[in-house]
Amino acid sequence: MHTEQMAIRSILAQVRKAVRGKDQVLARVLLSILARGHILLEDIPGVGKTTMALAFSKALGLRCQRVQFTPDVMPSDLTGFSVYNQERRGFEYHAGALMCNLFLADELNRATSRTQSALLEAMEEGQVTVDGVSRPIPQPFVVIATQNPVGAAGTQPLPD
């Protein structure tokens, strides 16, 4: 058996310890991660979407950040922000949640369109922009987003 196949089987075995009964979904998610694609999982709350994302992060040794999206999550929570430092007499950048390798966007369709837009920039361009300055996101960078079924309380459709 090839080394790559053994590595894939090992990763899936580790994730299966946390998530049971979703072998086809696990294989597709791993394929997307290895291809550096982004993943959108739709299902009702409480079926293990977050557990699966965290298990992949651990199995792959990726730095993971998770944001539970609600209408009050601001774009700066994702991108980071600048704060004035009086001692240095200048602004300092404080990194946001997107400065990681695997970003778990939990219940993305509960976020405002402005916050979703900040995430889309990171996904499409591999960077965040704060105060007109673009900052690269660490690579590899993969987003696993979850959404509740459209029409569930407090949700809004994601842009195409």
Regions found by a protein language model. Name each.
Residues 41, 104-105:
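Hydrophobic anchor at the beta1->P-loop junction of P-loop NTPases
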Residues 2-47:
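Pre-Walker A (pre-P-loop) alpha-helix and adjacent loop at the N terminus of AAA/AAA+ ATPase modules
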